[in-house]
Design a protein with these regions (language model features):
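Anionic-ligand binding patches
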Residues: 2-5, 11-164
Length: 164
């Protein structure tokens, strides 16, 4: 089976994906130099990554957004260096993590989108240095996953979506 190309360039993230998808050969390639997308929706951001990356194999990319339950994006507020970003108001505000994976099974094939949603809250402080992205900031509710299957203790909030 040829390797599936993960368009990201983050080897720690690739290790997480290899753990979630054992047995699937995975190659990691960085996003193109200068790549940028201003798409507000994670589905379009993930699709843009796949469309912008010239690969001669099946490939996928992911995009994540974190919102309040009424849809207000927390991405910019929590991604900043603002020291108040973990204030009590944020910690007590219910949040929803959206993950979209854009998959192109072969060169020229249509792009498929798989979406996962998990409800929870913002962490009191970021998790340690070996936890990536939103997993550092988001604490899932015990029954917060809106996808197939249950995630294990070692699996990130996005493991359900990737496994689909």
């Amino acid at each position: 089976m040829p390797a599936l190309v993960f368009i990201d360039g983050n080897e720690l993230r690739a290790q997480e994906i290899r753990r979630i998808l054992p047995g699937i050969p995975l190659a990691v390639e960085a996003l193109q130099t200068g790549f940028s997308t201003s798409a507000p929706e994670p589905a379009q951001r993930a699709r843009d990554k796949v469309l912008a990356h010239p690969v001669a194999a099946g490939c996928f990319a992911e995009a994540v957004d974190l919102t309040t339950l009424d849809g207000k994006s927390l991405r910019l507020e929590l991604d900043s260096e603002n020291e108040n970003r973990f204030c009590k108001w944020w910690r007590e505000t219910p949040a929803r993590l959206h993950l979209v994976v854009a998959l192109r099974r072969a060169p020229g094939a249509e792009i498929e989108l798989v979406t996962g949603v998990c409800e929870g809250r913002i962490a009191d402080q970021p998790a340690g240095p070996h936890v990536l992205g939103w997993d550092r900031l988001f604490v899932p509710a015990p029954d917060g996953a809106a996808g197939e299957g249950d995630k294990g203790d070692e699996e990130g909030d996005d493991g359900i979506t990737l496994a689909q």
